[in-house]
């Protein structure tokens, strides 16, 4: 199960694709609870400093908790996601899916900093899942879904 916490840009999209994200969590990790928390630039900078000793904001941070009620948390800063989307010529919505799915894969044990084989596998899975979720979301015929509806 995924719980979306925080409001603002991106929360509607994440609610729209929540079931699909839950399928990815179930496939990669199992039947666990994951929180996706939307935070400000200041909040993510503080978390990045506290837990990674990086004195700058980032787009996503993932914490494996393995507690009874919450397996892990994915902190996302929509402002940084938006900056990255512009830098990579991506839409905000697709970039947001990239970072949330990236976080899910970290919770599943994938790492891209040290292991080349696992890193390649992680990014291949990330690309596959993003395309699946993006394609399904864009083809949703409801009035409230699709690019530009956020």
From Swiss-Prot:
Binds 1 zinc ion. GO terms for biological process: rRNA processing. Keywords: Cytoplasm, Endonuclease, Hydrolase, Metal-binding, Nuclease, Ribosome biogenesis, rRNA processing, Zinc. Its main location: cytoplasm. GO terms for cellular component: cytoplasm. Its EC number is 3.1.-.-. PROSITE patterns: UPF0054. It is an enzyme of class 3 (hydrolase). It is found in: Cytoplasm. Single strand-specific metallo-endoribonuclease involved in late-stage 70S ribosome quality control and in maturation of the 3' terminus of the 16S rRNA. PANTHER family: ENDORIBONUCLEASE YBEY, CHLOROPLASTIC. This is Endoribonuclease YbeY. It comes from Thermotoga petrophila (strain ATCC BAA-488 / DSM 13995 / JCM 10881 / RKU-1). The gene is ybeY.
């Amino acid at each position: 199960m995924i719980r979306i916490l925080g409001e603002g840009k991106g929360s509607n999209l994440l609610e729209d694709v929540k079931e699909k994200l839950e399928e990815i969590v179930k496939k990669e990790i199992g039947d666990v609870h994951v929180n996706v928390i939307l935070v400000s630039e200041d909040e993510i900078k503080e978390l990045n400093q506290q837990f990674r000793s990086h004195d700058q904001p980032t787009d996503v941070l993932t914490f494996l908790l393995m507690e009874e009620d919450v397996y892990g948390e994915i902190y996302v800063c929509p402002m940084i996601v938006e900056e990255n989307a512009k830098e990579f010529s991506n839409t905000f919505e697709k970039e947001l899916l990239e970072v949330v799915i990236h976080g899910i894969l970290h919770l599943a044990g994938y790492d891209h900093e040290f292991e080349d084989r696992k890193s390649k596998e992680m990014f291949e899975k990330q690309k596959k899942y993003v395309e699946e979720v993006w394609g399904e979301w864009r083809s949703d015929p409801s009035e409230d879904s699709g690019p530009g509806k956020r």
